């Protein structure tokens, strides 16, 4: 193989990888009645904001195997018990990980990563009230479990709705839990 052919093939490979990584970060927004800010990332995950129990059957029809709820039961509009019942009635797994924005608990991140990477839970729908907590947790998962670089994960999290309040928590967790 000549040096020119080798270089051409190498460049083609690099462009293919760059294109694949850009597609991996693409966020597809959909309107789903009863779900605010629904965003599909890939075949294994979607994130969203407030989700009414009546919307759960539609998520099941879309192929989701689990719902991971990051809302506190005490939040206005949260229907944790009814949502859990709706998820189980739709034949999906329900994981409730109450994420307190005022004092985020790093242990909760460990539980989230364990839940979202469990093959039986894929594809998973992760939500909170507005999408910020879901975006922060997903960003952490991308760096810690998927070994993405921080900037790539931050770009994706920003597209999902990462907010200024949770960005420092996510970055601190990443910096203290990666080598």
Name each region found by the language model.
Residues 12-13, 139:
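A periodicity- and composition-biased signal for non-globular, repetitive helical segments
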Residues 13-22:
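Hydrophobic h-region of N-terminal signal peptides that target proteins for export
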């Amino acid at each position: 193989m000549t040096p020119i052919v080798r270089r051409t093939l190498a460049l083609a490979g690099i462009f293919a990888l760059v294109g694949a990584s850009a597609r991996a970060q693409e966020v597809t927004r959909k309107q789903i009645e009863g779900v605010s800010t629904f965003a599909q990332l890939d075949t294994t995950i979607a994130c969203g904001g407030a989700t009414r129990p009546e919307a759960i059957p539609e998520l099941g029809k879309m192929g989701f195997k689990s719902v991971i709820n990051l809302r506190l039961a005490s939040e206005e509009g949260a229907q944790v018990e009814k949502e859990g019942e709706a998820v189980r009635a739709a034949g999906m797994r329900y994981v409730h990980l109450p994420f307190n924005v005022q004092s985020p608990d790093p242990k909760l991140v460990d539980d989230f990563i364990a839940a979202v990477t469990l093959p039986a839970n894929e594809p998973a729908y992760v939500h909170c009230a507005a999408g910020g907590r879901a975006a922060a947790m997903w960003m952490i998962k991308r760096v810690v479990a998927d070994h993405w670089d921080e900037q790539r994960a931050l770009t994706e999290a920003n597209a999902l709705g990462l907010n200024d309040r949770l960005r420092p928590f996510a970055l601190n967790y990443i910096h203290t839990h990666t080598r």
